[in-house]
């Protein structure tokens, strides 16, 4: 229906405007055109037929709107001004208040709009006199209104940000052009100009326009108000208003500037006329000013003073600025803006602490806009910024020149982090202090800082600002979230997920095909082969049929299916060729032929041309391979099995191609290049994998079916970071696999792991014995290797050319093993796994299976098993199988058959060197045995040693040659001191580190062990030393008749080229350990000739781990060395020789094997110090009695606890001497001089037992030398698999001690203590990560009585306990007595919390190591008690990481900065879902209550879905370098503050005094790591103090995200999906935060109250009459004091009465209290003898005695009731009355004060004011002594005793008391009204809202305050 507008009778066409008519518009000329027409326009009524063209305002008003609308065609606008902004907005229309979506285009001074952007004609609005403003107070619909002289539009944007962008663009379009048009100048102009900022609002009282002075229209006085100065205008007058808004700078003050004579500028008042607040009082005459009838009187915008027009000249010129003077930046102090976009500030006189305010207008239940406006009204508008509009950068740039200032962030935690990040960018940490106002949802940081959980009311903002002014400062730690986003390919196991039946069937078929392929390749049974082949064909046919049925139109899938059939036919052809020889005419042949005929592709003609031509080539190659030889049996030779295996590989890959193509939504896990895998990988695993299940996924995962892949299902990352790996082993302990990060394969540092190189070398031996190096490249098809010439390389050396007694292999020639049939076939980088731990065990188990053949000593068996590698159990022909291995170009080492003196059990291998070998082995046979230890010691960390490092080694180089030559190699690591002559020598670096950085630490350790001889103490040099006397030969040398003394598997003899190394005189041949210390053991003059060499750090390139620059080629100049050795100080050690108690290999004793070495102290021995080499003595041998002597009661048993450590001892120094006697290997530990003895506890140790071994003394290292070496001791027992699950650890990389290392020098490391009948001595060697749980396993080994072991529950970390100390390195003065320890313990109490506990970081929860954590029983077992009682020792410090620098952080980038907490898993998933919900439906998340509700809903959703289940298998956690074993969890939270996700103390409060953890704080540079087991736990932590989920406290965290799936992560509530890679959390910096100081607030409040009372009393005294003034002296009690005195007498009398009654009714109580009550009663009687109060000065003197006695009575009564309240049973009425009497007495005593006057007498005075305006919350429940009672019925009741008899007292108030009461509430403006109406106490209590209105109290807030105060008086 058309709308008739009556306001358009006077149509005035603007001059100079031409109206165009467009005939194509289809509109009437009356509405659309202003041009002349034949029909004259009658300007009486205008009917608008298109209702959309008549706009309205937010309220229907009668303001004129022009009829004629100018329109323009866009076809003619090509030459007009550029478009400033365009887009769609909602436009408010008349019809039913609807919103229509319209297209708007903004140009300079013109706004166009149309229905769509494709319209040719647009409506034009002239913006020459523009006025725009917001339409809403709250941030609801983001609407704004545009008013011009001709038009009025109401527009709505989708968000406030978009609305402000449009308003800013309108401002830009209407402001004049500037020379610099950047955004900063525009924002700057907006700040510095005094333009008003309008918003539409209504008013509750008559309001007048400041432009036209008329009243605003409507009953609600609807109009526009400036959000800064509260200027009121009509909408039509807004464009006419002058720019006189609140000043911002000195330039904006203009002509009002007042300058003093000295040149200083005074801040003047800035007056705004009219519209004063209700009941405003003139600052001059103290009378009411303002009017509701007209615009009159003035108010100051800064100090908020009001003044009459007549009184204004009498007002002081200077403005005091107001209550927030300390925070306000006066505009007179801001002179200009300098060239760096910062203010030039002149600090005002007096106290000045400017406040910079950032408000997030979207936060706080959409109250941010209200706070933004309120802050602008209180402060300088240039101090307040909207984060949504301008961000933090503008404000920080402007405040850059302030020396110190405060920042107030009014928002949630996310905005606080944004501001802090900008502070980082501007580097302003030292000059700003940050406070937080909680406007967000969680507000965790505000809670911790003391600012509360929310702030919704802006009415008390001045009082809130005062709190921030009195705040104290604390430092907040900030942490960098460093991210290295790199896909880490980890084999995935079948995931536990909800799948459909079709997906489950598909997965089953793929798995079935995998198993059949395995049987085809491995089986020796013909029937099994036939059945497996037939089943395989049926399975593949069914699989192809089902997939093709669902993808009939997919041509690529059809091609892949044809390829699969082709591959299957090739496999069947291979089987047919295999069986043609031995089984011709068999049923097998017929079966295979039928299968081949059935498997022919149905469309060969169409699919063949589409196949890759390389397939036929590959087929021809494989046919040639397979047809070379025919088999005589199913037991295939290696080459034939290789061919058959290649066929199986092809079929498997074809299956995967089909499956992956049919599942486009599935993650492409298998699209990686293949690596060649040997036949050995086909063997089934000996043990099943663990019961671990990976994370669930919404997508079904087809189980990988690689039957040839070398990696396991449970492979873990152990080498992706320079942090040790102590991850919980959820699978069999035999396997420690690794997946490596991509790194340059030629230069893989030991801190990183690298995969198999693309180019490997095969070593083939010719007939002449020379080693031939052939560079080969891998065949991606799984077939043969092809060299550069295109010739096929044999998978192994030609067997015919090998000698029957030896076979040379490379010492790094590693067989690629598989542990599980279900693996990922397409991993990008293949690790080479050799499991040191199970090598010997499995070898002996294999021998045991072939027992009869082994006993016969078959020579052919020995030949076939020359490659002594780890084998699986279920391969019958593995002894004959030739192993295809990946060769690394290192000279070969000969492997021998198994030794007969090796005895192997489950986890212990004993090599008996006493065994007499009847058949002496040849030299080559002896050498052949060398590689077993080497092969077994190769770590999963570093197997891809580059061929370039060992390039051009001559043939015949043995392992020892390689090792010896590494020291003087031309290629060295950049970490080595040899690489640089300029850098400075770093302590703790050695050649061993350089070797280990190339070979890997595990290899290095094994090489050290293998090359260790009984001359280890000899120092080595590069030149041959002088002749030495012949050494005593070792047992192995004697028995074999070899002159080269050596241990088993030591270095073989050298070739003639290195003849000098072959002699006994060369010390360098004696092992690695000599090489390690060679540099420091040179003579002093040699050191002086050579400049010091220092280590430089390796260089890294992005995307890789180490660059080629990390290796240098050197030409070392050789120097002679002196024979003199550096002397080392001796250590005082008990002269006892300890015989080694060997553990047997029986099953019962094996089950009790632990990391504890038991030694029986038998006879005395002498410690041997090393003799100078010039004395020609290397060792001194000691003898002892026979080790077979049985221990009796007179012998001492020593138990050496050698727990495993994640450090492996490579970063600590040797601590003592190791003495091995000649008869039994008795070992004595000496206390170290520098640090811990690094013990590398291997998973399977080699125990050598020899009664003829010569003495071996490792001499002590110089204290001044900070050299590191591997203290690997092969003579230590290790853990069995049962306990190694949580006690073992496998380091991943080198650990370098930084300058901030926690290891200290000169600290003892071991101690002894005897227990029990056998005098057992527990020699505890302190390790950084000691596993004290092994102590529980001592009992099975030693028959100790119960009292022999200490009470571990009572050990509080004292140094007298078994584990010697609360700190790991605090073993000071072990010989000191208990008295000294007690004295030291007392001193510790005076230290800080950290020093008091003496704990070092990281502090790891000892229960984490337990397999069943966190599901521990309440009582706990013996192990748990050991762990908890000795947690200090367990959680002691470890070697920290090297100081973070660019080297360790290469490839990382800072994702964000953490201030509060970091979460990964379920909590981040909930936050991410909430964020997505809020972005999708912002209207549903506009209140804090709704947000909490959504969090609950999303958390409950996770309770059912569990999308983050089994997160422990997708992430790895490292705390300060220690790998943390993770239980089954759903999330990990890292806390910096003790508040998480809305106020939850997720760490839990510490209640125990002996808590092993430090109290959490946000300024201690310590992070708290906790586990999240589910949403139920997160909800329960809000109510219950949970602590069982604590993991650790540390200073750095690394999280490795495995796989290829993104994981949700949140930082301070901001969540996102993080790709796989590594995350490091490192300390970034600290920022000053303002914390609420309640004690200072109370002090200030009390001081201000006293000042107010003093001023009131002065005013009262001056206004009182002369007679009243004469009586109101200090000597005479005033009328008001007399009233208080009467109440005091009443309270004392009541208390005396009920105390006496209490004593009488309970005679058992003490009678002293009765005497005190009598004394108080007598003193009370003395002040009113005969019922009349004393008069004059004597009354005050007597009152002193009454106050003292009554206070003593009160204290004694409270003490009695507190002590006896639990057992005292009172009558209910007596308890109630006694409680009330005590409460009243407490209140009255607060009003009393005793002062000493000038004459020396004590006088009593009373406080006449009400002491409690806000009653204490504790008074509302029960008195404190009642609350202490338990079980009392009265104590359980909600008892509220009356504080005072306030209602009765208020009834007796006079007018003066009522006035005082008003003044205490800061309502002094109503004093005159109450005095005029004679309002006394009785009238005050009965006042209502209408009465207050009659008294002039019309302000709503004041009415509420007075009524509430009256209500409190009545209730009390």
Curated annotation (Swiss-Prot):
Under SMART domains, the record lists: C1, DAGKa, DAGKc, PH, SAM
Chief localization class? cytoplasm
Enzyme class at the top of the EC tree: transferase
List GO terms (cellular component aspect).
cytoplasm; plasma membrane
ZnF (Phorbol-ester/DAG-type) spans are: 195-245, 268-319
Q: Where is the DAGKc domain?
A: 350-486
Alphabetized, the UniProt keywords read: ATP-binding, Cytoplasm, Kinase, Metal-binding, Nucleotide-binding, Phosphoprotein, Repeat, Transferase, Zinc, Zinc-finger
As for family, the record states: Belongs to the eukaryotic diacylglycerol kinase family.
Compartments annotated for it: namely: Cytoplasm
Kindly state a single biological-process term from the GO annotations of this entry.
Answer: phospholipase C-activating G protein-coupled receptor signaling pathway
A single Pfam family it belongs to is: DAGK_acc
What parts of the sequence cross the membrane? none
Question: Recorded GO terms, molecular function?
Answer: ATP binding; ATP-dependent diacylglycerol kinase activity; zinc ion binding
Q: Where is this region: Disordered?
A: 1-36, 623-648, 846-874, 1018-1067, 1183-1214
The name this protein carries in UniProt is Diacylglycerol kinase eta
Q: What is the lineage of its organism?
A: Eukaryota, Metazoa, Ecdysozoa, Arthropoda, Hexapoda
Q: What is its EC number?
A: 2.7.1.107
Residue ranges under compositional bias (Low complexity)? 19-36
């Amino acid at each position: 229906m058309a709308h008739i507008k009556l306001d358009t009778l006077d149509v005035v066409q603007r001059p100079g405007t031409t109206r165009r008519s467009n005939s194509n518009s289809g509109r009437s000329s009356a509405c659309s055109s202003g041009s002349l027409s034949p029909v004259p326009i009658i300007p009486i009524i205008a009917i608008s037929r298109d209702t959309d063209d008549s706009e309205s305002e937010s309220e229907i008003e009668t303001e004129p709107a022009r009829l004629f609308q100018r329109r323009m065609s866009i076809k003619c606008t090509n030459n007009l001004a550029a478009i400033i902004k365009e887009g769609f907005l909602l436009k408010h229309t008349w019809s039913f208040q609807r919103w229509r979506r319209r297209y708007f285009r903004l140009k300079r001074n013109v706004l166009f709009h149309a229905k769509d952007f494709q319209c040719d004609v647009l409506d034009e609005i002239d913006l020459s006199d523009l006025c725009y403003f917001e339409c809403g107070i709250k941030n609801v619909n983001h609407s704004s209104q545009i008013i011009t002289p001709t038009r009025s539009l109401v527009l709505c944007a989708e968000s406030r940000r978009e609305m402000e962008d449009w308003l800013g663009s309108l401002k830009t379009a209407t402001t004049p052009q500037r020379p610099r048009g950047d955004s900063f100048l525009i924002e700057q102009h907006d700040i510095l100009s005094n333009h008003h900022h309008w918003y539409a609002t209504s008013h509750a009282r008559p309001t007048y326009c400041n432009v036209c002075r008329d009243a605003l229209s409507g009953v609600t006085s609807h109009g526009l108000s400036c959000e800064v100065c509260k200027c009121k205008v009509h909408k039509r007058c807004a464009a006419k208003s002058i720019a006189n808004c609140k000043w911002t700078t000195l330039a904006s003050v203009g002509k009002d500037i007042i300058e003093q004579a000295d040149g200083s500028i005074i801040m003047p008042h800035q007056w705004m006329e009219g519209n004063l607040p209700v009941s405003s009082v003139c600052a001059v005459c103290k009378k009411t000013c303002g009017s509701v009838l007209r615009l009159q009187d003035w108010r100051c915008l800064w100090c908020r003073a009001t003044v009459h027009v007549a009184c204004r000249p009498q007002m002081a010129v200077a403005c005091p600025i107001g209550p927030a003077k300390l925070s306000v930046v006066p505009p007179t102090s801001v002179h200009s803006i300098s060239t760096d976009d910062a203010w030039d500030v002149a600090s005002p006189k007096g106290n000045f602490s400017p406040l910079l305010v950032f408000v997030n207008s979207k936060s706080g239940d959409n109250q941010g806009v209200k706070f933004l406006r309120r802050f602008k009204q209180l402060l300088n508008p240039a101090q307040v910024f909207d984060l949504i509009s301008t961000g933090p950068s503008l404000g920080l740039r402007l405040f850059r020149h302030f020396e110190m200032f405060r920042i107030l962030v009014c928002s949630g935690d996310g905005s606080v982090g944004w501001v802090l990040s900008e502070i980082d960018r501007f580097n302003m940490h030292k000059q700003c202090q940050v406070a937080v106002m909680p406007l967000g949802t969680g507000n965790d940081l505000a809670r911790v800082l003391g600012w509360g959980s929310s702030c919704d009311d802006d009415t008390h903002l001045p009082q809130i600002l005062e709190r921030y002014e009195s705040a104290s400062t604390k430092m907040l730690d900030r942490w960098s979230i460093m991210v290295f986003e790199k896909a880490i390919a980890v084999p995935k196991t079948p995931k536990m997920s909800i799948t459909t039946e079709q997906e489950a069937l598909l997965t089953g078929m793929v798995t079935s095909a995998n198993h059949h392929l395995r049987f085809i390749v491995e089986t020796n049974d013909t029937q099994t082969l036939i059945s497996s082949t037939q089943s395989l064909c049926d399975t593949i046919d069914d699989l192809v049929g089902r997939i093709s049925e669902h993808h009939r139109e997919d041509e690529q899938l059809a091609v892949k299916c044809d390829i699969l059939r082709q591959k299957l036919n090739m496999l069947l052809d291979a089987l047919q060729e295999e069986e043609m020889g031995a089984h011709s005419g068999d049923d097998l042949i017929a079966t295979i032929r039928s299968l081949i005929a059935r498997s022919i592709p149905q469309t060969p003609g169409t699919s063949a041309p589409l196949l890759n031509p390389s397939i036929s080539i590959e087929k021809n190659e494989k046919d040639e391979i397979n047809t070379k030889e025919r088999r005589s049996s199913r037991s295939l030779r290696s080459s034939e099995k290789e061919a058959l295996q290649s066929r199986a590989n092809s079929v498997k890959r074809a299956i995967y191609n089909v499956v992956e193509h049919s599942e486009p939504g599935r993650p492409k896990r298998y699209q990686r290049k293949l690596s060649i895998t040997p036949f050995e990988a086909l063997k089934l695993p000996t043990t099943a994998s663990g019961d671990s299940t990976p994370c669930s996924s919404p997508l079904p995962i087809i189980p990988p079916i690689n039957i040839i892949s070398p990696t396991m299902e449970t492979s873990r990352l152990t080498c992706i970071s320079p942090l040790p790996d102590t991850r919980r082993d959820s699978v069999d302990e035999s396997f420690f696999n690794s997946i490596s990060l991509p790194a340059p394969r030629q230069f893989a540092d030991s801190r990183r792991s690298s995969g198999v190189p693309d180019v490997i070398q095969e070593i083939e031996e010719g007939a002449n014995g020379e080693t031939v190096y052939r560079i080969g490249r891998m065949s991606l098809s799984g077939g043969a290797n092809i060299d550069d010439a295109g010739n096929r390389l044999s998978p192994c050396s030609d067997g015919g050319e090998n000698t029957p007694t030896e076979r040379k292999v490379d010492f790094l020639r590693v067989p690629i093993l598989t542990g599980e049939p279900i693996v990922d076939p397409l991993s990008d980088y293949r690790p080479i796994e050799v499991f040191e731990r199970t090598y010997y065990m499995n070898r002996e188990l294999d021998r045991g299976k072939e027992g009869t053949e082994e006993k016969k000593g078959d020579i052919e068996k020995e030949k076939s098993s020359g490659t002594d590698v780890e084998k699986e159990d279920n391969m019958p022909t593995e002894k004959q199988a030739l192993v295809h291995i990946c060769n690394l170009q290192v000279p070969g080492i000969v492997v021998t058959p198994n030794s007969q003196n090796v005895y192997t059990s489950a986890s212990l291998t004993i090599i008996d060197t006493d065994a007499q070998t009847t058949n002496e082995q040849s030299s080559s046979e002896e050498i052949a045995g060398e590689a077993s230890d080497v092969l077994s010691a190769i770590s999963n960390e570093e197997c891809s040693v580059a061929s370039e490092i060992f390039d051009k080694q001559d043939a015949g180089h043995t392992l020892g040659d390689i090792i010896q030559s590494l020291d003087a190699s031309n290629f060295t690591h950049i970490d080595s001191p040899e690489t640089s002559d300029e850098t400075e020598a770093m302590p703790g670096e050695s050649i061993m580190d350089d070797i280990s950085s190339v070979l890997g630490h595990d290899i290095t350790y094994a090489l050290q062990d293998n090359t260790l001889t009984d001359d280890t103490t000899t120092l080595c040099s590069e030149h041959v030393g002088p002749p030495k006397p012949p050494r005593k030969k070792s047992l192995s040398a004697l028995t074999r008749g070899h002159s080269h003394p050596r241990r088993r598997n030591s270095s073989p003899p050298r070739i003639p080229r290195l003849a000098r190394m072959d002699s006994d005189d060369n010390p360098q041949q004696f092992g690695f350990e000599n090489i390690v210390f060679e540099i420091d053991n040179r003579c002093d003059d040699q050191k002086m000739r050579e400049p010091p060499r220092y280590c430089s750090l390796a260089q890294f390139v992005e995307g890789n781990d180490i660059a080629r620059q990390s290796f240098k080629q050197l030409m070392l100049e050789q120097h002679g060395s002196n024979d003199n050795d550096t002397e080392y100080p001796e250590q005082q050690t008990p002269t006892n020789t300890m015989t080694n108690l060997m553990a047997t290999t029986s099953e019962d004793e094996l089950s009790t094997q632990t990391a504890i070495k038991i030694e029986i102290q038998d006879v005395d021995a002498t410690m041997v110090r090393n003799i100078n080499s010039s004395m020609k003595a290397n060792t001194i041998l000691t003898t002892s009695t026979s080790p077979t002597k049985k221990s009796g009661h007179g012998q001492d048993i020593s138990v050496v606890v050698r727990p495993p450590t994640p450090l492996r001892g490579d970063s600590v120094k040797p601590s003592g001497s190791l003495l091995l006697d000649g008869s039994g290997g008795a070992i004595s530990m000496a206390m170290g001089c520098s640090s811990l003895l690094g013990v590398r506890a291997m998973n399977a140790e080699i125990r050598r037992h020899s009664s003829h071994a010569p003495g071996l003394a490792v001499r002590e290292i110089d204290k001044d030398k900070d050299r590191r070496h591997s203290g690997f001791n092969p003579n230590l027992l290790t853990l069995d698999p049962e306990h190694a699950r949580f006690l073992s650890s496998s380091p991943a990389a080198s650990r370098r001690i930084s300058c901030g290392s926690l290891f200290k020098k000169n600290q003892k490391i071991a101690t002894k203590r005897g227990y029990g009948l056998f005098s057992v001595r527990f020699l505890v060697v302190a390790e950084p990560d000691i596993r004290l749980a092994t102590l529980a396993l001592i009992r099975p080994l030693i028959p100790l009585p119960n009292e022999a072991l200490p009470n571990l529950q009572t050990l509080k970390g004292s140094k007298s306990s078994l584990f010697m100390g609360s700190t790991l390195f605090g073993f000071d003065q072990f010989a000191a007595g208990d008295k000294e320890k007690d004295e030291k313990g007392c001193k510790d109490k005076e230290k800080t919390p950290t020093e008091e506990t003496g704990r070092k970081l990281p502090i790891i929860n000892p229960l984490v190591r337990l397999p069943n954590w966190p599901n521990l029983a309440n009582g706990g077992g013996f192990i748990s008690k050991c762990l908890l009682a000795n947690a200090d020792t367990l959680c002691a410090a470890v070697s920290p990481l090297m100081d973070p620098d660019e080297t360790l952080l290469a490839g990382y980038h800072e994702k964000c900065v953490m201030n509060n907490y970091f979460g990964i898993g379920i909590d981040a998933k909930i936050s991410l879902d909430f964020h997505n919900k809020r972005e999708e439906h912002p209207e549903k998340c506009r209140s804090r209550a709704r947000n909490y509700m959504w969090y609950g809903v999303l958390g409950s959703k996770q309770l059912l879905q569990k999308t983050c289940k089994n997160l422990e298998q997708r992430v790895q956690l490292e705390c300060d370098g220690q790998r943390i074993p993770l239980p089954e969890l759903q999330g990990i939270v890292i806390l910096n503050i003790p508040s998480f996700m809305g106020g939850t103390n997720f760490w839990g409060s510490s209640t125990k005094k002996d808590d092993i953890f430090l109290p959490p704080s946000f300024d201690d540079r310590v992070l708290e790591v906790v586990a999240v087991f589910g949403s139920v736990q997160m909800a329960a932590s809000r109510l219950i103090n949970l602590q069982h989920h604590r993991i650790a406290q540390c200073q750095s965290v690394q999280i490795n995200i495995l796989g290829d799936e993104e994981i949700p992560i949140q930082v301070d509530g901001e969540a996102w999906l993080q790709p796989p890679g590594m995350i490091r959390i490192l300390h970034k910096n600290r920022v000053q935060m303002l914390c609420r100081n309640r004690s200072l607030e109370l002090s200030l409040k009390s001081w201000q109250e006293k000042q107010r009372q003093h001023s009131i009393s002065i005013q009262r005294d001056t206004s009182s009459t002369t007679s009243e003034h004469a009586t109101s002296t200090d000597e005479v009690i005033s009328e008001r004091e007399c009233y208080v005195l009467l109440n005091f007498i009443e309270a004392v009398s009541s208390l005396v009465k009920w105390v006496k009654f209490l004593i009488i009714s309970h005679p058992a109580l003490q009678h002293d209290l009765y005497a005190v009550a009598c004394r108080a009663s007598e003193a009370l009687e003395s002040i009113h003898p005969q019922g009349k109060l004393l008069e004059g000065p004597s009354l005050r003197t007597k009152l002193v005695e009454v106050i003292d006695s009554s206070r003593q009575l009160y204290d004694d009564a409270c003490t009695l009731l507190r002590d006896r309240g639990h057992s005292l049973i009172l009558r209910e009425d007596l308890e109630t009355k006694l409680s009330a009497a005590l409460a009243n007495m407490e209140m009255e005593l607060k009003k009393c004060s005793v002062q000493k006057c000038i004459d020396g007498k004590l006088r009593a005075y009373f406080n006449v004011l009400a002491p409690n305006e806000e009653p204490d919350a504790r008074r509302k429940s029960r008195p404190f002594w009642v609350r202490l009672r338990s079980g009392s019925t009265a104590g359980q009741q909600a008892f509220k005793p009356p504080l005072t008899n306030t209602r009765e007292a208020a009834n007796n108030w006079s007018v003066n008391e009522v006035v005082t009461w008003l003044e205490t509430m800061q309502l002094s403006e109503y004093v005159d009204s109450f005095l005029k109406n004679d309002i006394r106490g009785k009238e005050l209590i009965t006042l209502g809202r209408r009465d207050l209105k009659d008294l002039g109290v019309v302000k709503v807030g004041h009415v509420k305050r007075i009524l509430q105060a009256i209500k409190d008086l009545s209730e009390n």
